[in-house]
Amino acid sequence: MVHFTAEEKAIITSLWAKVNVEETGGEALGRLLVVYPWTQRFFDNFGNLSSASAIMGNPKVKAHGKKVLSSLGEAVTHMDDLKDAFAHLSELHCDRLHVDPENFRLLGNVLVIVLAHHFGREFTPQVQAAWKKLMSAVAIALGHKYH
């Protein structure tokens, strides 16, 4: 289990309060699909994913990105018990969707980049470290059912 300090929790929740879930989620998922094109196979019902511009403008990508990032809100509010908070999603992605758990880590890395882009100077190395720690812990929690 990952332990978050009071300072890390404050950093994460403070930034999360400013995140535009719809915009950031769509951008993060879109970037994942562009940068790691093999992840597109999990979204074959999303229509046109033939180019970066098609992916970034795809309404289904944006909608699912919002859904993914909304789920991340659970991580922010349940940092002390991520395994239980993500048990259902871990089971879904393992048993039904058969998503490679490495993709959770990749999405976390992409999200950190998107947050850095959106928040600029406010996204200090300390903020980056806290968010990287959270995203790593979320990836572990989502991959729990696989082990």
Swiss-Prot record:
GO BP, sorted A to Z: hydrogen peroxide catabolic process
KW Nucleotide-binding (keyword) present: no
Sequence positions that bind heme b: H64, H93
Similarity remark: Belongs to the globin family.
Tissue specificity of this protein: Red blood cells.
Name this polypeptide is given: Hemoglobin subunit gamma
Cross-referenced InterPro entries: Globin (IPR000971), Globin-like_sf (IPR009050), Globin/Proto (IPR012292), Hemoglobin_b (IPR002337), Hemoglobin_oxygen_transport (IPR050056)
Oligomer status and interactors: Heterotetramer of two alpha chains and two gamma chains in fetal hemoglobin (Hb F).
Signal peptide: none
PANTHER family, sorted: HEMOGLOBIN FAMILY MEMBER, HEMOGLOBIN SUBUNIT EPSILON-2
UniProt function note: Gamma chains make up the fetal hemoglobin F, in combination with alpha chains.
Gene behind this protein: HBG
Source organism per UniProt: Cephalopachus bancanus (Western tarsier)
Metal-binding as UniProt keyword: yes
Gene Ontology CC terms, in alphabetical order: blood microparticle; haptoglobin-hemoglobin complex; hemoglobin complex
